Amino acid sequence: MKQLLDFLPLIIFFTVYKLVDIYTATGALIAATAVQIAILYFVYKKVEKMHLVTFAMVTVFGTLTLAFHDDAFIKWKVTIIYSLFAIALAVSQIMNKSIIKAMLGKELKADDNIWARVTWYWALFFIGCGVLNVYVAFSLPLETWVNFKVFGLTALTLLNTVISVFYIYKHAQPEQDDTAN
């Protein structure tokens, strides 16, 4: 259910965009993200920082989009969120406190240099996606950007996740058997 909740605002944004327009879709995105946060809080009694940052950015840039009737704001939101993620990953790695290791290190055992590579890889991935978003958002038609945002970036993220998991598994330390004498 949690994975569905992660995609709920995106699905609603896309559907409303296709049925109405970018401005109504932006309002729906703000509302859907607020509902997502509320459900996460009431069901799981916890809301991750990533969701809160995303909600804040959606609210700020969505409101600017609606107030100025200018879709450039909602287009920039994607790049800014990805930039913040890249910065957070880079800073965490520089401080030797990899966010990715903190999230996955209990389930997957790997050397710190593997976690560092994966962390830098994701930081570069987010920078690349942010740059690509700017290109698509401001060089191609709105319809293309919406499709890219919903399907392209989602597919790229899933592909990147698969690549990362395979890389970590390839270099993972074998589980130690606690029952061995």
UniProtKB/Swiss-Prot annotation:
Give yes or no: UniProt keyword Cell membrane.
yes
Any transmembrane segments, and where? 22-42, 50-70, 72-92, 118-138, 148-168
| The keyword Coiled coil belongs to this UniProt entry's keyword annotation | no
A GO CC annotation given for this chain: plasma membrane
**What is the topology of this protein in the membrane according to its UniProt annotation?**
Multi-pass membrane protein
The protein's UniProt keywords, in alphabetical order, are: Cell inner membrane, Cell membrane, Membrane, Transmembrane, Transmembrane helix
Where, subcellularly, is it found? Cell inner membrane
Supply the NCBIfam families for this chain.
ispZ, PRK00259.1-2, PRK00259.1-3
> What family, per the record?
Belongs to the YciB family.
What is the documented function of this protein?
Plays a role in cell envelope biogenesis, maintenance of cell envelope integrity and membrane homeostasis.
| Protein's name in the database | Inner membrane-spanning protein YciB
Species the sequence originates in: Shewanella denitrificans (strain OS217 / ATCC BAA-1090 / DSM 15013)
